[in-house]
Amino acid sequence: MERVEGWLIDADYETIGGKAVVRLWCKDDQGIFVAYDYNFDPYFYVIGVDEDILKNAATSTRREVIKLKSFEKAQLKTLGREVEGYIVYAHHPQHVPKLRDYLSQFGDVREADIPFAYRYLIDKDLACMDGIAIEGEKQGGVIRSYKIEKVERIPRMEFPELKMLVFDCEMLSSFGMPEPEKDPIIVISVKTNDDDEIILTGDERKIISDFVKLIKSYDPDIIVGYNQDAFDWPYLRKRAERWNIPLDVGRDGSNVVFRGGRPKITGRLNVDLYDIAMRISDIKIKKLENVAEFLGTKIEIADIEAKDIYRYWSRGEKEKVLNYARQDAINTYLIAKELLPMHYELSKMIRLPVDDVTRMGRGKQVDWLLLSEAKKIGEIAPNPPEHAESYEGAFVLEPERGLHENVACLDFASMYPSIMIAFNISPDTYGCRDDCYEAPEVGHKFRKSPDGFFKRILRMLIEKRRELKVELKNLSPESSEYKLLDIKQQTLKVLTNSFYGYMGWNLARWYCHPCAEATTAWGRHFIRTSAKIAESMGFKVLYGDTDSIFVTKAGMTKEDVDRLIDKLHEELPIQIEVDEYYSAIFFVEKKRYAGLTEDGRLVVKGLEVRRGDWCELAKKVQREVIEVILKEKNPEKALSLVKDVILRIKEGKVSLEEVVIYKGLTKKPSKYESMQAHVKAALKAREMGIIYPVSSKIGYVIVKGSGNIGDRAYPIDLIEDFDGENLRIKTKSGIEIKKLDKDYYIDNQIIPSVLRILERFGYTEASLKGSSQMSLDSFFS
């Protein structure tokens, strides 16, 4: 028997002799190895099912009759209460769904939806991206492998050094989105973390064949792309089928398989960075270049865009296209280096492989964390609810009109987790009768002791984060240890702050409507109480929202703010800290404001400048208006700036890039009930043979003519030229000349993007179109 230590990378199972065998993909200094456990059976729980039913339980498929392998009586615990039930074992994981459906007719079936290999990770206390020790017999085979006799987790600070391969495909389409049925792949650009940059081009058959060979020879642990799950991999599969090339890049020689529309590569992680970008709410347009720009990693080495590929390739200027492909691969690689470390840590915390973690929303991540913690204390998980109820949200104080100087924003750090801990809010503490905490307004009661399931986990997460932050103070921010610990504390913060939303999520196993409702009720109470305390100390509360308040007072100093915070700490059981000092700030309405921090940064929250469905010119003018008001305190100049832009549109002095509007296609155009402008633009493109896949950003412009806005929306892929006035548009009948709808851009883009801001300073729509002038003095607080 040998002992081998390494990192756990992935977990799945293989059917050997009719039995499901857990397969662990691990890595040590020698490389990849596989460990097999033959001694683990799929199982789930049932409550309220008679033993006779279990003895005779049978269901069937077309191929076989499915029966239980065995069952055993067990004392189970659910929401802290003891109940009698059974542990039910199946012959194979594929039998579990049928058995679950059959037995759910007779009682309560629990935890029958946990994938077999992930059940193994929970039961054995193992975690992907963490250390693992295996004792067992070494077996033969191409890949070093072991038969598990004993397995255990070895906690490690660092992450494994994964071999990464990033790739991006470029296709040749005469216009619009390429179609795999007819448009060939002309380039696959690759970058690895060994600093290799490889461009595969030439004959398509050779490109695909060389790409498969490259994956096999480089043997990456993780393959990364941007939107490759929905686009590159399906496209590659179609084109490979055309040439009879197997995509057999799995470490066991298997082909890429698609499960639920997701590519799975055996023994390799497959991460789509687009999934991560979709959860970053501050990135409104999810294009690769926008994400890179947001993260500060963007490099620009190409002088063409995607829409130019056909033109340059077909006239022989292939180097420009190759440079563009290289740029995409490098940007994808740099985004991966920025975003993946936190997901490595999340993988370690919730046990699952990184590629699964990147595809999950926060609620599902919390769900898996809770499943692991429940196992440790002998709890079985509830089932998600059949439906969820709504509840009143956070209390919002109406914002004060005008421009304000010398303002402090006080942040109620992790307010909702703090409330949950302070009042022991948890599904297993709800429904208390004696010695309870009672939520204001809603009256829900929670027992004071013992600690509930959520409170114990939240305390653990917060305490771990507190310990890490203490360690960080003693380290250099440039050290590798600091960076690792910082990733860990950020990950803990993300999970901690996700608990509140999880309680009201309709797919949560531990869904608890009263818990979520009570938490927001206490939150509203604390915001109101904080405002009253601040006012009693001479502060003016300008705005309050969810977990922060904005305060000011004549001659306010930081010492004044510190005294206020001390007083709030005396009265309230939550941590409060200064989020930002603003030298100037204005509020447009609830959840919408812009401020200039004391160190000169512009902070914009909830305004259209950060939205994706406005043209570039509207976003630019709004940002300039905000800057002029905050930095120069001159709304008249801001007004003049808007008038200049309106004049420029009228005189035809705008570029195509300035007037294009982008909006995402969230489903097939035929599935939309209401035909929005971007949908009709996509349909016009389809008439010309351009098919936009779901998740594409449709760029379109609005032209003059009859009909509604959608009737006059044309995709930029059909536009050949634009001179500021006239657009040359490809149609079935040839090139048509259409005029830009200047009135639409003035009335529905430019003016709406700034009007709500300028209205706060006394201006009207007529002011923007006319010559009204105002002074700022009457609006300055």
Swiss-Prot record:
Q: What class of enzyme is it?
A: transferase
Write the record's keywords in alphabetical order, separated by commas: DNA replication, DNA-binding, DNA-directed DNA polymerase, Nucleotidyltransferase, Transferase
Q: According to its UniProt record, which reaction does this protein catalyse? A: DNA(n) + a 2'-deoxyribonucleoside 5'-triphosphate = DNA(n+1) + diphosphate
> InterPro entries in the record, alphabetically?
DNA-dir_DNA_pol_B, DNA-dir_DNA_pol_B_CS, DNA-dir_DNA_pol_B_exonuc, DNA-dir_DNA_pol_B_multi_dom, DNA/RNA_pol_sf, DNA_pol_B_thumb, DNA_pol_palm_dom_sf, DNA_pol_type-B
Pfam families per record: DNA_pol_B, DNA_pol_B_exo1
Question: Cystine bridges: which residues?
Answer: none
Gene Ontology biological process terms, A to Z: DNA-templated DNA replication
> What family is it from?
Belongs to the DNA polymerase type-B family.
> What is the name of the protein in this document?
DNA polymerase
